[in-house]
Amino acid sequence: KENYSPKNLFSSTIGDELKIASQGRSDVYSIAPDAESAILSAGHAANGAFWMDNTNGKWATTTYYKGIPWYVDRYNNGPESLASRLETMVWTPTLPMEKYDAFPYVLDDLPFRYTFSEKFANCYPNLKTSPFINKEINRLALQFLEYGGFGTRSCPDMLSITYYAGNYRGTMSKEYTREIQDTYYQLDQDIEKLLDTIDKKVGLANTLVVFTGSGYYKSEESYPDGLMVNGGEFHPKRCLALLNMYLMAIYGQHTSWVQGYYNNQIYLNRKAIEDAKLDLTTLQNKAAEFIQEFSGVQLVTTGRSLLTGDWNEGTAKFRQGTHHLRRGDLIIELQPGWKVNLDNPKEKVKIIRNNAVITPLVFMGNGLKPQHTVSYTHLTLPTNSLV
């Protein structure tokens, strides 16, 4: 069943802009551990996007993009495929254990050892959170550089690569600290190998390398008893039930006025509101005033206010970080330290923190002089496309 495509991506990407500028003559591909990253990096007009399949470890794509390069298909089914090498892959420390000293709160000096086998559940998802995923991405990227003709045409080509530098198995940052240090150490070597290959095949003088990162932060964290000095638990299900009762008391009990909750956003029943010929702005405002009184709620912003321009510097992040066709009717910001408890045993409790994620953006290429600039950037796509 086809599950992935960029059709729900509302913005243009750098790859899209390159396709437009070259009138379709440039090749644009992306490689990433997961489908979302691959498709977001590729865009609508790309030639292809590839990610590692969680069931067999092969490089997968979507039928939205037409055709698979022959060398990708050969790699997937040949002697170099991941499945043919999996049993020999063992992750152990690359350096002596005393070299992993970046985190002072590490509690032990025990070495680690992880193996990967299709006999075990989550084999490939686990591998995708180890340094091996970056090496596999490099191996496929080298196929593109060797056989894809990158840099040999009159128009520039683009190969977008997403590496993984998070915690093993998605655990908390305080766990597997030796592992994440080893991941960074090996990633540095992987990037070096990629740049050396580009230099040999195309020449770094003929290449623009754009390096950036999204930052890494896991909101799930546990505190020893008695050390959490502020905060509490916010239960979205209880909040929705009380909000629906409140709106029923005002507008009638013949329907449910609340549709659902997702990612700190509440969605109202738009069809019921339209059928009842109610004013959406008024209803959103009443709901926001009600939610604002909940313990732990710092701010409630209505989707209508963001759409009509009735927003300020404090709520600008909601407007810039959401699309009006997907945005909830109410966007909730909790106070720092409060936990979001979805009342689902399968979901971890999320602790709300205000984190400033510093995002590096490095340009390297012929004619670019070394310099360091710190700036608050609103739009990066036009700048990258221009460069």
Residue ranges and their predicted role:
Residues G24-D27, S154-M158, L204-L208, R326-G328:
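Loop/turn elements at helix/coil->beta-strand transitions in domains of secreted/extracellular proteins
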